[in-house]
Amino acid sequence: MSLSGLITALATPFRADGALDPDGWQRLLHLQLEGGVHGVVVAGSTGEAATLTDAEYDQLLASAVERIGGRIPVMAGTGLSGTAKTIEQTRRAAALGASHALVVTPPYVRPTQAGLIAHYRAVADQGGLPVVLYNVPGRTGCDMQPETVAELASHPNIVGIKEAVGDTGRVQALLALRSAQFAVLSGDDGTAARSIRAGIDGLISVGSNVLPGAYRRMCELAAAHDHEATESWDGRLQPFHEFCGVEPNPIPVKALLRRIGIGHDLRLPLLPLSAVHHPAADHLAGDIAALEALSSH
């Protein structure tokens, strides 16, 4: 399955007691299908993967594959700090039916660029799934350079990158690597429209958890080079882009999800949204239904 358009980095709904919320998860999956997204990511950073048990990981991924697998890509977050553990997690995701592995650069250990090349080649060779690279140095402490991506893009089982550095120069460098076999995806909602107009394939979004139709519309218009309409939609979504960054992801978007009846809480060490941001959350939540309705016209 091709990787393009809007892909939602799914949050993981929890109940008030901290347990998984299977009903909330099904409602979130339904919302994404209704919004026409082109793919989803299960158990990535937005999904609080670091807090999930193996059994919870399996439950989330298996139920997502059962509900929407075969229609759109179901990517699984499988990146861990060690190569052997990342391979093991990727094989686990493959056995559960994921279409791709989204593999973040190894957090905390700060490998060299040569180390990244060796790491990703090993995962691509042994993990059993097509690999999508994921660069988010603000979270991992490791910045994968475009030259490193260029070397990895030649591997037949490395099929794309999620680049969360919203720098224009970085996007331009990665555009040179884009091909039918290698997708370039933005991981930054706020700069995605501009990047898609420049030629990248799509967006892996946080805000689309609550506004799948609206973010899909923005991405489609950007890909069609309808500049005026793209600017209009990007402007409507700008308050959501900004709000999702007022505290570490996924705290803000989970506050919005809670306000539309999906999920209740986060897991430590993340805390609920600070009270100072509650008025903004209430205001934005009140706009969600109208924006989703408008996106279908």
From Swiss-Prot:
Its EC number is 4.3.3.7. SUPFAM superfamilies: Aldolase. PROSITE patterns: DHDPS_1, DHDPS_2. Pathway: Amino-acid biosynthesis; L-lysine biosynthesis via DAP pathway; (S)-tetrahydrodipicolinate from L-aspartate: step 3/4. Its main location: cytoplasm. It comes from the Bacteria. GO terms for cellular component: cytosol. The active site is at residues 134, 162. Gene3D superfamilies: Aldolase class I. The keyword Flavoprotein does not apply. One of its GO terms (biological process) is diaminopimelate biosynthetic process. The record marks 45, 108 as: Part of a proton relay during catalysis. Catalyzes the condensation of (S)-aspartate-beta-semialdehyde [(S)-ASA] and pyruvate to 4-hydroxy-tetrahydrodipicolinate (HTPA). This is 4-hydroxy-tetrahydrodipicolinate synthase. It comes from Stenotrophomonas maltophilia (strain R551-3). The lineage of its organism: Bacteria, Pseudomonadati, Pseudomonadota, Gammaproteobacteria, Lysobacterales. The gene is dapA.
